[in-house]
Amino acid sequence: MLFQKEKVMKGQVLAISGIDTGIGKTVVTGLLARCFAETGWRTITQKIAQTGCEGVSEDIAEHRKLMGIDLQEADLDGTTCPYLFRFPASPHLAATVEGREIDFMTIRRSTFRLQKLYDLVLLEGVGGLLVPLTPELLFADYVRDAGYGLVLVSASRLGSINHTLLSLEACARRGIPVRAIVYNRYFEADERIAANTREVIAAALKRYGFGEAPVIDLNTSGLSAEPGDLQRILNPPGQ
């Protein structure tokens, strides 16, 4: 266990991960942040680490654009993305190439600072759920040890059933509460595949013990999240 339970009242943290890289995590994080902000929650996003860029995190900049706000002071001072690497690879390798180390407590302290200022922090991961942050620490294990709930981004493209079920199984084995699946329809080519994949994923949520988690569509008009969906994400029934 990396972290001790804190008793200080602070903002909630939700982790955002995906079944693969390039699945739409950044867009989903920004749009979810906007949805929560519009319902009255003071919301900020954070990127656990970013590779392949310099200066301000490109994903954080995209979040702000989608939220309809300017870059914040916490973006410019690195709080919302404590680790930036030029080398475009998994964080553990990018850090090695640049002769640096990722300290999980540096990330945690940055999140604490944001929790003191906001009601809700959406923490976007890197790549998929099992991407290593360091040679010893996977993103999923970081989320588990921090006690965060998780929003998982899936998609309608071929192969998503396998990747999604593997991710749900990894969460179930670790005791990570899956709060929602965002179903990215930008990838769909055949409506029969898209519709069936969504049905299989919804059934899998129940099978793995996440039956209260909504499946929210992402399409060209944005997120199809209803106020009730947002409430279930933040305050799951029975918890």
From Swiss-Prot:
Enzyme Commission numbers on file: 6.3.3.3
Span of the signal peptide: none
Annotated positions binding substrate: T51
Cofactors, names only: Mg(2+)
GO MF annotation list: ATP binding; dethiobiotin synthase activity; magnesium ion binding
GO biological process, one term: biotin biosynthetic process
Residues binding Mg(2+), per UniProt: T26, D59, E124
Pfam families given in the database record: AAA_26
Pathway: Cofactor biosynthesis; biotin biosynthesis; biotin from 7,8-diaminononanoate: step 1/2
PANTHER family: ATP-DEPENDENT DETHIOBIOTIN SYNTHETASE BIOD 2, DETHIOBIOTIN SYNTHETASE
HAMAP family cross-referenced by the UniProt entry: BioD
Function text: Catalyzes a mechanistically unusual reaction, the ATP-dependent insertion of CO2 between the N7 and N8 nitrogen atoms of 7,8-diaminopelargonic acid (DAPA, also called 7,8-diammoniononanoate) to form a ureido ring.
Similarity comment text for this entry: Belongs to the dethiobiotin synthetase family.
Identification of the protein by name: ATP-dependent dethiobiotin synthetase BioD
Gene name of this polypeptide: bioD
